[in-house]
């Protein structure tokens, strides 16, 4: 498994986040029983950079906490990635995650939990998007929330 992490901001201290993000990604893959010959790219950015990305890709001109860019195609069921070949030894990219550490810090203070907990949650949330989950409907939202909570519980990260 390859996890590529790029800190492209200097407004929030990112020390110790790499190990946390790697643990979250590995846990999501375990929960979803996805093989480990995958590659995920994670970029830490500030609010200005994520605002620009959000405007370009989603037409929303404001900062958001996390953006997910899946590279794999999915079958009709969650987490079953068609393009990942289980027998292949070649590492296969499944997508990119972009997290605004500035927004994560703001939200951690707003919600009254640690910054690390917020980054872990955003990573789990985004990984589930990379694996085909969404929250457009109430049913999808419920399923995704249960998966997020399972990942956070396995990591022993509470609110």
From Swiss-Prot:
Alphabetical list of Pfam families matching this protein: YbeY (PF02130)
A single cellular component GO annotation: cytoplasm
Free-text remark on how the cofactor is bound: Binds 1 zinc ion.
Xref: Gene3D superfamilies: Metalloproteases ('zincins'), catalytic domain
An annotated GO BP: rRNA processing
GO molecular function: metalloendopeptidase activity; RNA endonuclease activity; zinc ion binding
Record keywords: Cytoplasm, Endonuclease, Hydrolase, Metal-binding, Nuclease, Ribosome biogenesis, rRNA processing, Zinc
UniProt-annotated location(s): Cytoplasm
EC number: 3.1.-.-
Cofactor names: Zn(2+)
SUPFAM superfamilies tied to this protein: Metalloproteases ('zincins'), catalytic domain
InterPro entries given in the database record: MetalPrtase_cat_dom_sf_prd, YbeY, YbeY_CS
Residues that coordinate or bind Zn(2+): 125, 129, 135
Family: Belongs to the endoribonuclease YbeY family.
Annotated NCBIfam families: rRNA maturation RNase YbeY
Function: Single strand-specific metallo-endoribonuclease involved in late-stage 70S ribosome quality control and in maturation of the 3' terminus of the 16S rRNA.
Descriptive protein name: Endoribonuclease YbeY
Biological source species: Thermoanaerobacter pseudethanolicus (strain ATCC 33223 / 39E)
């Amino acid at each position: 498994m390859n996890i590529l992490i790029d800190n492209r901001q200097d407004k929030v201290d990112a020390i110790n986040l790499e190990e946390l993000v790697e643990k979250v990604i590995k846990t999501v893959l375990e929960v979803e029983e996805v093989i480990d010959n995958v590659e995920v790219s994670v970029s830490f950015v500030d609010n200005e950079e994520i605002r620009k990305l959000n405007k370009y890709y989603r037409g929303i001109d404001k900062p958001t906490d996390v953006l997910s860019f899946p590279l794999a195609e999915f079958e009709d069921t969650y987490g079953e990635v068609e393009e990942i070949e289980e027998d292949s030894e070649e590492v296969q990219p499944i997508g990119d995650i972009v997290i605004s550490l500035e927004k994560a810090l703001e939200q951690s203070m707003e919600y009254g939990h640690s910054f690390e907990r917020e980054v872990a949650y955003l990573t789990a949330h985004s990984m589930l998007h990379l694996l085909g989950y969404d929250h457009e409907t109430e049913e999808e939202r419920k399923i995704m929330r249960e998966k997020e909570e399972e990942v956070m519980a396995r990591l022993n990260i509470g609110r």
